[in-house]
């Protein structure tokens, strides 16, 4: 190999390495948040939550949060959704609202299931009785948080260390955010934005909350409780 061939081969290889690294960096930067399919059919929660509400809620509202979040974070350092929430006080209102909306709804769909309802069992049931007195008292307090939230927001059951606490947040905020008044790991949440219930219940939020207990996925809630740090 003569000198010219050596130089061409060496620098060609270096260029390939640099280009490959650049492509990987672009792929990492291009990583985007996605809208997962519902874990059940749109009409699976009937008669408690109607098909059209689920279609609009998932296909329009949740999809918009995902699209807006991707647009707002384009060209920035890739972070997990949880990392974004943990430092949301340093980020724009657009990222705050849409990261919260994406996390909240992704969890919300899994907190419900067809033929749900009933009562929790195991460690979760024991902790609810310990921290609220009984399951019925817990339901009453959670319902008050949901119906008492003025305007749009969420009601939460969260784990703080080894204790369960009920809280509510405005808009798409949640207890994982560093700006939350009450912080903790959500193990159950209820969306009380009007788009979650208005087609079927109009302004009767309390009726929606009462009906929602029939679709709660206590298996999922129990798993989140056990895994919460």
Protein language model features and the residues they cover:
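N-terminal secretory signal peptides and thylakoid transit peptides that target proteins
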Residues: 1-14
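Hydrophobic h-region of N-terminal signal peptides that target proteins for export
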Residues: 15-21
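C-terminal segment of N-terminal export signals and the immediately downstream linker at the start
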Residues: 21-48
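Divalent metal-coordination and catalytic microenvironments
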Residues: 35, 62, 102, 157, ...
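Second-shell loop/turn segments in exported
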Residues: 51-55, 92-93
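All-alpha RGS (Regulator of G-protein Signaling) helical domain and cognate RGS-like helical scaffolds
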Residues: 60, 66, 70-79, 85-167
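An amphipathic alpha-helical core segment
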Residues: 144-202, 210-211, 215-216
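N-terminal targeting pre-sequences for secretion and organelle import
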Residues: 207-229
């Amino acid at each position: 190999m003569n000198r010219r061939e050596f130089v061409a081969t060496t620098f060609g290889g270096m260029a390939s390495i640099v280009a490959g690294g650049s492509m990987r960096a672009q792929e990492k930067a291009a990583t985007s948040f996605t809208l997962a399919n519902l874990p059940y059919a749109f009409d699976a929660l009937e008669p408690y939550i109607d098909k059209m509400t689920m279609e609009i809620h998932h296909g329009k509202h949740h999809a918009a949060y995902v699209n807006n979040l991707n647009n707002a974070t384009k060209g920035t350092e890739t972070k997990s959704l949880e990392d974004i929430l943990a430092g949301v006080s340093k980020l724009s209102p657009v990222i705050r609202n849409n990261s919260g909306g994406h996390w909240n709804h992704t969890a919300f769909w899994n907190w419900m299931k067809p033929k749900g309802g009933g009562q929790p069992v195991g460690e979760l049931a024991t902790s609810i009785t310990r921290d609220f007195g009984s399951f019925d008292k817990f339901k009453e307090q959670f319902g008050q948080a949901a119906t008492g939230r003025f305007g749009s927001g969420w009601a939460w059951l969260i784990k703080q260390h080894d204790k369960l606490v009920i809280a509510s947040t405005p808009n798409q905020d949640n207890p994982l955010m560093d700006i939350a008044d009450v912080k903790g790991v959500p193990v159950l949440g209820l969306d009380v934005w009007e788009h979650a219930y208005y087609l079927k219940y109009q302004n009767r939020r309390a009726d929606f909350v009462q009906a929602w207990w029939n679709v709660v996925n206590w298996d999922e809630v129990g798993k989140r409780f056990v895994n919460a740090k």
